[in-house]
């Protein structure tokens, strides 16, 4: 039990259904969908699409999503990959001939086809109850009438305005400036697009007037996108991957997501007595940082479009983790591995919903960087992700940019099982941090017996491209001790990541946790 004289929040308890996400309005709408007879899929789509209006710097219909779900009464895990592909005309040789060494963050070269809309349509048709029109209605309403900008959203928005280009500045700034907390943000053009999707499904987005607007905007900036690229976009069901840690089994998406990195990281940590360490002390932070460097080095070498990746079994093998764990010196930080060419500051939303039939949905949805590419279509203001910046331009690399390929993705929804039964859908937003965030959350639960909210609240650190980012919630002695071990310690500009989770209690009670680093909450009924 937490100390109620200290700042913090309690876990949320409910019996019928629950949502945990990063904005209270989205959580409220999701619960309302459940109360109206919808299931967890209906509610998750409603909340996620609304988050594109509440947190447009993080996500939107120009982005991608990944989903894990468990059908009611079943223990099987369904994985839907809603990430889009590069346009067929993308050619890494041409980019290198232009002098590029990485895919430019704000260029059309970074814009992959948005996959989320197709995934939402497919998910609603295959697993929803109320239909897509019902799920999109709340976002349409609030896009038209507007939402007050939340404090954390305003903080992030102000840091990201330089990314916006051309007509995107008109659509996503108010009088040329980022909105402040409490100002009303409206997106009437997106409401128009969502109405069309509600009436006519995916074709209203990937074909016809909306698609023509998107292709024209990208072509005008030098993009090689075609109407056929959009029409051919299709989400895919895949076979999830899993790994055990203590009494928990972690389920993740296979590549092109980085879920295998989280499993590898936990496999490395198995070789250390994490439970015997101070949960918020120097030793645990050091070992986690070293394991992160090694696991992410493997990710940067191997993770790619599954049609091109050949090393998944190697990443998941216990022998690989044992060999990597042997490289860790408990008394000294190793040099940082060579950074991957994918950029690191990614913005994402996460939503999890559990309904009365105990269907669980774990959904993550993103435009990659804050405001993605910064490019929006001229008529409908669809803001494009820059997920193609996750490609490398290293010739022959499995994640080399190429036409029709999916880039390595950082966004990963998670799901935990206990004793073979569904236990907890969860996610940790935060770009590259997500794999480390998954591992830290799991070890908080398993090794230290933390409840859902405490496992989210605890301080975080992240070994990232030559530095060890350490939140201010760690004491100064930890900062100093890590520096003494050779880490290049820095305090990040903002908090690290943002987590949401819902546990299925043994007595049928749902227990939700939501990260105080965000504006959101867990709500149940």
Residue ranges with predicted function:
Residues 237, 345-348, 409-411:
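Short, small/polar residue-rich loop motifs at catalytic or cofactor-binding pockets
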Residues 272-367, 379-380, 387, 493:
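Internal maturation/activation junctions in enzymes
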Residues 1-28, 32, 40-207, 212-257, ...:
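Noncatalytic scaffold domains of N-terminal-nucleophile
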Residues 357, 405, 438, 447-494:
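Extended C-terminal subregions enriched in glycine
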Residues 251-259, 348-352, 364-376, 428-434:
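Glycine-rich phosphate/pyrophosphate-binding beta-alpha loops
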Residues 59, 63-71, 349-354, 413-415, ...:
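Short beta-strand scaffold segments in enzyme catalytic cores
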Residues 53-70, 74-79, 224-226, 360-424, ...:
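Active-site rim segments in enzyme catalytic domains, especially the processed small/beta chain
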């Amino acid at each position: 039990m937490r100390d109620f004289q200290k700042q913090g929040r309690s876990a949320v308890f409910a019996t019928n259904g629950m949502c945990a996400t990063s904005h209270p309005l989205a959580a409220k709408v999701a619960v309302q969908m459940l109360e109206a007879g919808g299931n967890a899929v209906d509610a998750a789509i409603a909340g996620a699409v609304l988050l594109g209006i509440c947190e447009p710097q993080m996500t939107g219909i120009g982005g991608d999503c990944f989903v894990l779900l468990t059908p009611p009464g079943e223990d099987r895990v369904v994985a839907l990959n809603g990430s889009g592909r590069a346009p067929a005309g993308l050619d890494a040789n041409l980019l290198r001939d232009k002098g590029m060494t990485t895919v430019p963050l704000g260029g059309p070269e970074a814009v992959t086809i948005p996959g989320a809309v197709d995934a939402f349509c497919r998910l609603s048709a295959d697993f929803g109850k109320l239909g897509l029109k019902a799920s999109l209605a709340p976002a349409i309403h609030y896009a038209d009438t507007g939402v007050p900008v939340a404090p954390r959203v305003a903080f992030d928005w102000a840091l990201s305005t330089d990314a916006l280009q051309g007509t995107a500045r008109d659509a996503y700034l108010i009088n040329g400036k980022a909105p402040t907390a409490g100002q009303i943000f409206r997106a009437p053009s997106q409401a128009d697009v969502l109405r069309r999707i509600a009436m006519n499904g995916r074709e209203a987005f990937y074909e016809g007037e909306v698609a023509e607007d998107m292709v024209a905007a990208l072509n005008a900036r030098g993009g090689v996108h075609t109407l056929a690229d959009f029409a051919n976009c299709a989400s895919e069901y895949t076979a999830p991957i899993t790994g055990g840690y203590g009494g928990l089994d972690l389920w993740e998406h296979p590549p092109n997501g980085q879920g295998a990195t989280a499993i590898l990281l936990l496999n490395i940590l198995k070789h250390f007595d994490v439970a015997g360490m101070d949960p918020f002390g120097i030793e645990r932070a050091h070992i986690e940082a070293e394991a992160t460097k090694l696991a992410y080095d493997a990710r940067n070498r191997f993770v790619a479009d599954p049609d091109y990746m050949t090393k998944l079994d190697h990443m998941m093998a216990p022998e690989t983790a044992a060999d990597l764990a042997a490289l860790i010196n408990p008394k000294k930080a190793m040099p940082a591995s060579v950074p991957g060419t994918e950029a690191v500051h990614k913005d994402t939303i996460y939503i999890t919903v559990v309904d009365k039939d105990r269907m669980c949905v774990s959904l993550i949805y993103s435009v990659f960087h804050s405001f993605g590419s910064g490019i929006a279509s001229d008529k409908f203001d669809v803001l494009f992700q820059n997920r193609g910046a996750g490609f490398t331009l290293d010739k022959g690399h499995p994640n080399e940019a190429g036409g029709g390929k999916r880039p390595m993705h950082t966004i990963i929804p998670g799901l935990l099982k206990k004793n073979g039964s569904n236990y907890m859908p969860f996610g940790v937003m935060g770009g590259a941090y997500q794999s480390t965030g998954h591992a830290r959350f799991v070890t908080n639960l398993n090794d230290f017996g933390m409840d859902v909210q405490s496992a989210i609240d605890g301080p975080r650190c992240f070994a990232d491209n030559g530095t060890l980012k350490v939140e201010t919630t760690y004491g100064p002695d930890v900062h100093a001790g890590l520096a003494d071990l050779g880490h290049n310690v820095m305090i990040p500009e903002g908090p690290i990541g943002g987590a949401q989770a819902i546990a299925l209690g043994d007595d049928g009670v749902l227990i939700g946790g939501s990260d105080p680093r965000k504006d959101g909450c867990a709500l149940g009924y």
